Amino acid sequence: MNYKVYAIGNKVEKFYSDAIREYQKRLSKFCNITFSSYKNSQKLPFQDTDKYYKIVISPAGKSLSSEELAEKIKEFELTGITDILIIIGNEKIHCSDTLSISSMKMSLGLTSTIFFEQLYRAYKILNNEPYHK
């Protein structure tokens, strides 16, 4: 599975960036994942994302449990969807799906970090591995 995660808005604080890098490292045994932040959506490199299934993370999106997210990833794999673009911080971009981390508004860095943590948790579930050591 290949993921591109685009965070749109204010700068992501260093401590969140550090946490995201840690989750990228942990996720590397399950998938390929990149993280990029942009000041606004006009700067997004959409030209190379036509093949990607696009998901917006928004408080107004569909809420999933960790197990449901794991099941969604499994469905993607079974249906041949291998390239996924996650957009955090801009709810107006047209996408295939809209998911929610929480119905509460959070900072861009916190939302991004929680998304990475939940993706990692979903892969641990899919691989029948314990999450906590």
Regions found by a protein language model. Name each.
Residues 1-5, 81, 132-133:
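Short, Lys/Arg-enriched, disordered terminal segments
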Residues 16-20, 66-70, 112-113:
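Conserved strand-to-helix beginnings and helix N-cap segments that scaffold or border functional pockets
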Residues 86-90:
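Glycine-rich beta-strand-to-loop/alpha-helix junction loops that act as flexible
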